[in-house]
Amino acid sequence: MAEVVQSGPVEAQARHVVYCGVCTLPPEYCEFGGTAKKCEEWLKEKQPELYQRLHSEEAISANLSTLSISAQERAAKDAAKKEAKAALAEARDAERKAASKVQIKRVERNKRKHVTVIAGLEVYGLENKKVAKELGKKFATGSSVTRSAAGNEEITVQGDVSDDVQDWLLEVYGKEIPEANIEIIEDKKKKGSS
C-alpha cells in the first residue's frame, strides 16, 4: 500500500517589521510625523540598508518623478512647514524645561513626623511611579504618587530625606535635571486652634 503524503496549507511566515525608535511608526511612515529629521537620523544610524532603500538619491528622485510639478511644490512646502513646526515645538519644550523647577518640600505631619514631597519631575520626562519606587528602595521608606490640590502628580516619601533626595536626583538623573532647577522648601503645618 502506497503512503499518500498530504500537503496541507503551508503556514504563513510572520513578517518582521522594523519600527522607528523615535516616533514608533514603521520608517515608511516617519515622514508623516513631526519628527522626520530625527527619524531619518535614527534610521541612518540603526538601519543603514533600509535608510538607503528609503532615502537614497535614486529613491527620492523616483518618487518625485511620479508627482506633478504642482504636487512637488506642495510637498516641499508641507515638508518645510512640518520642519518649522517641529523645531518650534522643540524650542518651546527646551524653554519649558529651563523654566520649570523640581520642588522638594519637607512637610511636618505631627510633632516629630515629616514627609518629603517631590513635585515637577514629569516636565523632565521622568515617570513618577518609577521614581517613587526607586526612592522607596533607596531610602527604605514608603513612597507613593499622589495628586496635589492643584491636580498635579507628586511623590510623597515618608521621613525627612529632602537633602538626600536632592543628592540622589543629581546623581541618578543629573543629565535630565540641572542642579539649578532643584529647590528645597521647608513647609511647616500650622497648629489648629483647639
From Swiss-Prot:
Pfam families from the UniProt entry: DENR_N, SUI1
Cellular localization per UniProt: Cytoplasm
Single GO BP term: ribosome disassembly
Primary location class: cytoplasm
GO molecular function: mRNA binding; translation initiation factor activity
UniProt KW keywords: Cytoplasm, Ribonucleoprotein, Ribosomal protein
Cellular component GO terms, alphabetical: cytoplasm; ribonucleoprotein complex; ribosome
Signal sequence coordinates: none
Matching InterPro entries: DENR/SUI1_TIF (IPR050318), DENR_C (IPR046447), DENR_eukaryotes (IPR005873), DENR_N (IPR048517), SUI1 (IPR001950), SUI1_dom_sf (IPR036877)
SUI1 domain boundaries: 102-173
Description of how the protein assembles with itself and partners: Interacts with the 40S ribosomal subunit.
Family: Belongs to the DENR family.
PANTHER family listed in its UniProt record: DENSITY-REGULATED PROTEIN (PTHR12789:SF0), DENSITY-REGULATED PROTEIN HOMOLOG (PTHR12789)
Domain comment, as recorded: The SUI1 domain may be involved in RNA binding.
Protein known as: Translation machinery-associated protein 22
Protein encoded by which gene: tma22
